[in-house]
Amino acid sequence: MASVIFHAFHQIAEKGSMKLFRSHRPEYVDGGQMRDFVYVKDVIEVCMFLMHHRKNSGIYNLGSGTARSFLDLANATFNAMGKEPSIEFVDTPADIRDKYQYFTEANMSKLKSIGYDKAFHTLEEGVGDYGTNYLLPGAKCY
């Protein structure tokens, strides 16, 4: 499955705008639904750490440890593309609306307790790196 950023880059490149789900809960603004976005390069770093610290094998939560909104992700994507944000909010499909998670955030305490202390990329850093190096036409890995 392709990342939200991958889809966003392509939507913006093709249409000049992107779509996000409208909120169906009063405590969240449209696009205010939150996820713990983590950059794949950070996941690789953690995997490498765990490979070298085998005595600490087990099941670990993995994320940045900080929930950010889809609106933040959209703005970071537009910024990485050098474009002004243009976001269209659409209804969450009825068949998933009641099950849709509005907030997820990884508890990173177990990983930190075994000595992992490397900083994770911010959302803006991860989106910028991914877009610049992998998604934009002319990127070194395009």
Q: At which residue positions do the language-model features occur?
A:
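Short amphipathic alpha-helices and their capping/turn segments at secondary-structure boundaries
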Residues: 6-12
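C-terminal substrate-binding subdomain of Rossmann-fold SDR/epimerase-dehydratase oxidoreductases
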Residues: 12-142
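Flexible, glycine-rich beta-alpha linker
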Residues: 1-6, 28
